[in-house]
């Protein structure tokens, strides 16, 4: 007997394949914008396993693009209302569901302050997608296990 998590991990290659077939137009749009208006700094906002995937994204971005990337504590934006100067910078949000209010509110506030916002979300038509300027769907399919296994692997794939 295999667990749901193992089943989803074993099927994650389908999500990566699906991304290769569908993600290019959205990636090209984001890449074009970043080339026209390159940020000096990028931020990530995420929770749980998505935050771990965001760390991988940050590592790749720093190594390949050369701009610093920091994980932003969402409470600094939402609860403490810190006057962050983010105009012209980029924020990348990562989520399986795109439903977390603190994640959505962080992106909404950072975008209002002038940050380019990109959401990598598995669930389409989510509040996080609506709050972001750009949306990169993960195409992982429905999640059955608690750990969002396919979405985690799909985020790693989309980040690369």
Residue ranges and their predicted role:
Residues 1-38, 147, 153-157:
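Cofactor-/ligand-binding subdomain signature composed of acidic, glycine-rich
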Residues 37-160:
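Glycine-rich phosphate-binding loops that contact phosphosugars or nucleotide phosphates
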């Amino acid at each position: 007997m295999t667990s749901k998590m193992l089943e989803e991990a074993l099927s994650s290659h389908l999500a990566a394949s699906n991304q290769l077939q569908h993600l290019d137009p959205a990636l090209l749009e984001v890449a074009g914008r970043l080339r026209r208006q390159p940020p000096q700094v990028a931020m990530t906002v995420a929770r749980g396993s998505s935050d771990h995937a965001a760390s991988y994204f940050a590592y790749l971005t720093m190594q390949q693009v050369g701009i610093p990337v920091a994980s932003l504590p969402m409470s600094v934006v939402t609860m403490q209302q810190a006057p962050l100067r983010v105009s012209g910078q980029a924020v990348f949000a990562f989520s399986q569901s795109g439903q977390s209010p603190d994640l959505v509110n962080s992106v909404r506030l950072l975008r209002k302050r002038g940050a380019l916002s990109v959401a990598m979300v598995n669930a389409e038509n989510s509040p996080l997608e609506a709050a972001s300027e750009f949306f990169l769907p993960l195409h992982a399919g429905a999640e059955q296990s608690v750990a969002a296994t396919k979405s985690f692997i799909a985020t790693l794939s989309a980040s690369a």
